[in-house]
């Protein structure tokens, strides 16, 4: 994943946060993110159906993710006071089911947006691209999130 590409997406997150601040409903941030991402040249789909199959049969047609950017990066938006690890697990499941490499859980209800953007990487892509799992390397993550990304990668390997 191109580092400049992910920086541009994160820049859109910062812009929405700087304009709106914390404390609004998730749906408001979602609409603002769609507008900001499109203004920056991204293709964005919202409330995308995530089909779940079991033994070849569709068993859950109504699971939905918040945003998918250029059919590559999933953004799961939150506006909560109590961030829970289940949000990262939820995003990881979306990444796996949609066959995407990278996603971010973003909690807009914070005083520091930089500390509230959580990268999640699909293990399938880590292995196929030769990422080091135990060598403290997460080369696709932006530098400002590298330690957070490394933690998430290592954590996702040991559920």
Segment roles from a protein language model:
Residues 25, 30-72, 111-124, 132-139, ...:
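Active-site metal-binding core of divalent-cation-utilizing nuclease and nuclease-like domains
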Residues 1-20:
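Interdomain/boundary linker segments immediately adjacent to catalytic/signaling cores
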Residues 1, 125-159:
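Intrinsic disorder/low-complexity segments
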Residues 78-126, 135:
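Nucleic-acid nuclease catalytic cores
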Residues 21, 65-83, 94:
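Conserved catalytic cores of phosphodiester-cleaving nucleases, focusing on short active-site segments
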